[in-house]
Amino acid sequence: MGARLTTPVPGHDVDLFDDYCEHLLVRDAQSLQVIGTYRVLTPAQAKRVGGTYSDTEFDLTRLRTLRPRMVELGRSCVHPDHRHGGVIMALWSALADFMVRNELDTMIGCASIPMLHNGVVSGDAAASIWQQVRKTHLAPIEYHVLPRLPLPVEHLAGSIAVDPPALIKGYLRLGARVLGAPAWDPDFNTADLPMLMRLVDLHPRYRKHFLGA
């Protein structure tokens, strides 16, 4: 994606939030290789580090009442050889268990769209995906957030027929909502959509699967 990382470990994605996060891992049963990851920043740890990664990309003022029971998800990654659905479902199951055990009910995060996505370049894909999801999956206005470095969607082609990345589609199927227009992340050269998922909004099919309710 053309990432330009400034980290203490060359070639590795490391930032100041890592040491404050819980890290969910899925390992291959045979090789024990890590094949799936999530990092989770709890409310208590967010206070310790001074905020969330999402705070660096968006003004989250309107989410202040949610923060006491809100975690931030990030760095979701599944090994290319295991992107058949099983690994991400295992991660989501572990995440649901983590939320319930810790009496948390809200998740936020930045869902990334590469500047080059499905052959569409220069942010037109991200602008088009934003125009799609704002019509069907936009959160109530009281939860809207503002990007600190907005993607200039008004100057991009926003009517291209392009599917969102698989992870974003998965979040939307679960019942997640988009909190506003995308920010541009120059370090990773992506457009980042702010997303929110509340357990109360979990689609009934997945509620039964993950929560047994």
What function would you assign to each model-found segment?
Residues 3-7, 33-37, 105:
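Short secondary-structure capping/junction motifs at helix and strand boundaries
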Residues 1-20:
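An N-terminal domain-cap segment
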Residues 25, 32-42:
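Conserved beta-strand in the GNAT
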Residues 194-213:
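Long, continuous compositionally biased terminal/linker segments
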Residues 26-29, 197-198:
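Active-site beta-strand termini and strand-to-loop segments that position acidic
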Residues 21, 35-37, 70, 192:
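Extracellular structured ligand-interaction cores
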Residues 43-177, 182-190, 195:
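Acyl-donor binding region in acyl/amide transferases
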Residues 15-25, 48, 188-191:
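A short helix-loop-beta-strand connector motif used in the catalytic cores of GNAT acetyltransferases and
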